[in-house]
C-alpha cells in the first residue's frame, strides 16, 4: 500500500469523478448527479459522501456517516472471525502393551476431543525390542479405529515412521 493510499472506501473530497449515481441517507436512489452537488447535499445533512461501488459507470455513492460505516464494517469482520472454528490437532500417545483400563481412558479422551470438533493424532511408540512386534501395534490401532468408527473418520491410515506408528482421525461432518 502506498503512503497516500488509505484503507476503506473513498469519501468526500477523495471522489474525483465529475458525476456519480447517488443514494441518499434514506437509501433512495437519486439518479446521476454531479459530485459537487452530492457533496453539498451531504454537507447540509452533516454526513459524508462515500463511494460504495467504485467500479460502476458512473460510480455509486451513498450519503452516510463514515465513522458509523467503518464501525459496522469492523463489527462484521469481528463477527466473522469469531464464527470461524480453529481446528486443533490433539495427540494421544500409546505404547503397544497398553493395559485395558489405560486404553479405556485414552478412548474417552479421544471421544471428548472428537466431540469438541478437534482432530486427533494417535501415536504409538515402540521402545527397544517392541519393534520386533509391530503386529501388536497394528492390531491396537485397528481396534482403536473400530472403536471410534461411529463418531470419527480416518484421515490418515496407520503408518510407521522411525520407531512410532501414527494415525490421524477427524470428526465426521
Swiss-Prot record:
HAMAP family: IF_3 (MF_00080). Belongs to the IF-3 family. Disulfide bonds: none annotated. The lineage of its organism: Bacteria, Pseudomonadati, Pseudomonadota, Alphaproteobacteria, Hyphomicrobiales. Signal peptide: none annotated. One of its GO terms (cellular component) is cytosol. GO terms for biological process: ribosome disassembly. This is Translation initiation factor IF-3. IF-3 binds to the 30S ribosomal subunit and shifts the equilibrium between 70S ribosomes and their 50S and 30S subunits in favor of the free subunits, thus enhancing the availability of 30S subunits on which protein synthesis initiation begins. Keywords: Cytoplasm, Initiation factor, Protein biosynthesis. InterPro entries: T_IF-3_C_sf, T_IF-3_N_sf, Translation_initiation_fac_3, Translation_initiation_fac_3_C, Translation_initiation_fac_3_N. Gene3D superfamilies: Translation initiation factor 3 (IF-3), C-terminal domain (3.30.110.10), Translation initiation factor 3 (IF-3), N-terminal domain (3.10.20.80). Monomer. It is found in: Cytoplasm. It comes from the Bacteria. GO terms for molecular function: ribosome binding; translation initiation factor activity.
Amino acid at each position: 500500500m502506498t503512503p497516500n493510499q488509505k484503507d476503506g472506501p473513498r469519501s468526500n473530497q477523495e471522489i474525483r469523478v465529475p458525476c456519480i449515481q447517488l443514494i441518499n441517507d434514506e437509501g433512495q436512489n437519486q439518479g446521476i448527479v454531479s459530485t459537487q452537488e452530492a457533496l453539498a447535499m451531504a454537507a447540509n445533512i452533516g454526513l459524508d459522501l462515500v463511494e460504495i461501488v467504485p467500479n460502476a459507470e458512473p460510480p455509486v455513492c451513498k450519503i452516510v456517516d463514515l465513522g458509523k460505516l467503518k464501525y459496522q464494517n469492523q463489527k462484521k469482520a469481528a463477527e466473522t472471525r469469531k464464527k470461524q472454528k480453529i481446528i486443533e490437532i490433539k495427540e494421544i500417545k500409546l505404547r503397544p502393551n497398553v493395559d485395558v483400563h489405560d486404553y479405556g481412558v485414552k478412548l474417552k479422551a479421544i471421544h471428548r476431543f472428537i466431540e469438541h470438533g478437534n482432530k486427533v493424532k494417535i501415536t504409538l511408540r515402540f521402545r527397544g525390542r517392541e519393534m520386533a512386534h509391530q503386529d501388536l501395534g497394528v492390531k491396537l490401532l485397528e481396534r482403536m479405529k473400530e472403536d471410534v468408527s461411529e463418531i470419527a473418520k480416518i484421515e490418515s491410515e496407520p503408518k510407521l515412521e522411525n520407531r512410532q506408528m501414527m494415525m490421524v482421525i477427524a470428526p465426521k461432518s
